[in-house]
Curated annotation (Swiss-Prot):
Gene Ontology CC annotations of this record: cytoplasm
Function: Catalyzes the condensation reaction of fatty acid synthesis by the addition to an acyl acceptor of two carbons from malonyl-ACP. Catalyzes the first condensation reaction which initiates fatty acid synthesis and may therefore play a role in governing the total rate of fatty acid production. Possesses both acetoacetyl-ACP synthase and acetyl transacylase activities. Its substrate specificity determines the biosynthesis of branched-chain and/or straight-chain of fatty acids.
Name by which UniProt lists this protein: Beta-ketoacyl-[acyl-carrier-protein] synthase III
Annotated metabolic or biological route of this protein: Lipid metabolism; fatty acid biosynthesis
Length: 324
């Protein structure tokens, strides 16, 4: 029976590095404090003339090629981002479609913050398994630096820029086993992008977070969510080949890893070099594992993510891409 499969993974990493040492010169913080509290050592920052759609396009082109397809084979583009090119329209997905030379295809954005890539997998799975679409391009892309207040030391130390992409198509062997997504809007004010009204035509956006509250809820929610999706599918944690979580904070990742009793060899961690890239973090981490030879065709992968909204989700899949 044919089912939805993640047939490729790719990423685009901006060249500019913003290290903790650099941040010491910008706000009242230290490299030691940031690393101890978050696990982050550096993050990437896009050029001023690079938009979120540009980052996403570069990752998308690699993902399409790795799926042995051409851009014209894509019949839907889904983008998860909290830092779109434009405040309301056009969507970043439409901009990427234009960059790829594609018209008359479905293209839309999903707003699920750091959980965005899990939501993309769920939607792409539904589209291809229903027969509505054949090859769905999913992209997590973020230029968080465009909405970052670099005078706010509580949050500017956390985030970076980047993009990751993959293609979802049908396969009869290595497919997406299950995806679970959920939300609780009662906690929306703990993590948000705040709009301040300067005039009727001029607005500024900045990200705000109540970190301690978010941390506690994230650890409890993710720990329960991954246990539930494994139990639902009668899979033991030890059967997982790779655990690839959203890269928000090393302490959150380690808490869930400990809950599952997984070895370091089975846990993919990239937060130290990219920071939190929101919806892009899971596909970026997957691509690192793929290019390092850790992620191989047929591997059983567990993904999880938690983000503003609150939103969260997890996914179980057997990777369908060819080995790097």
């Amino acid at each position: 029976m044919l089912k939805a499969s993640l047939k490729s993974i790719a990423s685009y990493i901006p060249e500019k590095i913003l290290s903790n040492t650099d941040l010491e010169k910008m706000v009242d913080t230290t490299d030691e404090w940031i690393a101890r509290r978050t696990g982050i050592k550096e993050r990437r920052i896009a050029n001023e003339n690079e938009n979120t759609s540009d980052l996403g396009t570069k990752a998308a082109l690699k993902a399409i090629e790795r799926a042995n397809l051409k851009p014209e084979d894509i019949d839907a583009i889904l983008v998860a981002t909290l830092s779109p090119d434009y405040f309301t329209m056009p969507s970043t997905a439409c901009k990427i479609a234009s960059n790829l030379g594609l018209v008359n295809i479905s293209a839309f954005d999903i707003s699920a913050a750091c959980s965005g890539f899990i939501y993309l997998l769920e939607q792409a799975k539904a589209l291809v398994e229903s027969g509505l679409k054949k090859n769905v391009l999913i992209i997590g892309a973020e230029k968080t630096s465009s909405i970052m207040d670099y005078s706010d030391r509580s949050i500017c130390i956390l985030f970076g820029d980047g993009a990751g992409a993959g293609v979802v198509s049908l396969d009869n062997e290595n497919y997406i086993l299950d995806v679970h997504t959920a939300s609780n809007g009662n906690y929306g004010d703990l993590l948000m992008t705040q709009r301040s009204q300067k005039s009727s035509l001029c607005q500024t956006l900045s990200m705000q977070m109540k970190g301690n509250e978010v941390f506690k809820i994230a650890v409890n929610t993710l720990s329960n969510d991954v246990v539930e999706i494994l139990a639902k599918n009668n899979i033991l944690a030890q059967e997982i080949d790779l655990f690839i979580p959203h890269q928000a904070n090393l302490r959150i990742i380690k808490a869930v890893q400990e809950k599952l009793n997984l070895s370091d060899e089975k846990c993919v961690i990239t937060v130290q070099k990219y920071g939190n890239t929101s919806a892009a973090s899971i596909p970026m981490a997957m691509n690192d594992a793929y290019e390092e030879g850790r992620l191989k065709k047929g591997n059983l992968i567990l993904l999880d993510a938690f983000g503003g909204g609150f939103t969260w989700g997890s996914a179980l899949l057997k990777f369908g891409g060819e080995n790097f």
